[in-house]
């Protein structure tokens, strides 16, 4: 069992910030275009469907963790045994690392496209790795503190969005239901990876005091993030025509260009720099989860694992040289996310639920 000393644990209310910090990141800047490809401006319904699925999955996760009284590593070892369980654990550790790399590389690309076109991918990635090393090596409570601070970046994002509202044309959303239900489901599937991150709680559970009391805060954190994604989608749909949106990679950043302030010429510079608060929390959490999982599987020092992961991040970032490579990497990560989170977790839930019912009926028979 994963036992954590109380001095390293956090209060249940902070789970709100952890879920939001992991879930709301770089994906929101461009996912409106992605879902519009599948269902046009009915794509917002796909966001609602994904949001509802997330709340259901969080409930399943709490059920699983309560039955195990440990984290994901303990759960899979109990269900499948040490060897097979560790195979699944390694898969999840790799998945969390992939998520972290995808967020880092996406943010580096945004900096290069919008701010410094000649900036070195290696140097920008190295800087982000050094920042994350300092935060993660300081402990989980510091990571939680960063997630709390990142709310400031989210509020800044909302503040800028209010300036864009006066340029919105809400009749763009009409008529609704112009696409088939299968198209809407496709848009829901395409929004999954951008809205993922809540699964981080599978590793966080032992670090929370009275973890079952944090369930409502986890649901509220997910609700806050889901509403932000829905708001961002509707805002992008109302601001751009459908043809314009399909040609705009980072819709949310493009919208800031219409905001005019007398003392700032390039507001997107401020927006991207400020949004770093949000981005940092969305890549240090999966990186920490991957490090923690690897530590519990192989029983090696966490600092050594973290340094090794930074080398992997630097190498992979260098290999992703253009938008096509980055997009393929993220698309493949999204497929892995779908199968691990939206397929595997419900299957695991069913197995544990059936096992629990069987044990209960067996006990009553005796």
What are these regions (language model features)?
Residues 10-30, 46, 54, 92-96, ...:
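Hydrophobic, membrane-embedded alpha-helices of multi-pass small-molecule transporters
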Residues 49-60, 96-103, 131-132, 151-165, ...:
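Selective recognition of specific alpha-helical transmembrane segments in multi-pass small-molecule
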Residues 97-100, 104, 136, 152-177, ...:
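Hydrophobic alpha-helical segments and their helix-loop junctions in multi-pass secondary transporters
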Residues 1-31, 39-41, 207, 351-366:
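Membrane-interface "cap" regions at the ends of multi-pass membrane proteins
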Residues 239-268:
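Membrane-interface interhelical connector segments
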Residues 107, 122-123, 135-162, 333-346:
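Membrane-interface loop-to-helix entry segments
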Residues 37, 106-112, 128-150, 207-210, ...:
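Membrane-water interface regions at transmembrane-helix termini and the short interhelical loops
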Residues 28-121:
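Membrane helical hairpin/interfacial module
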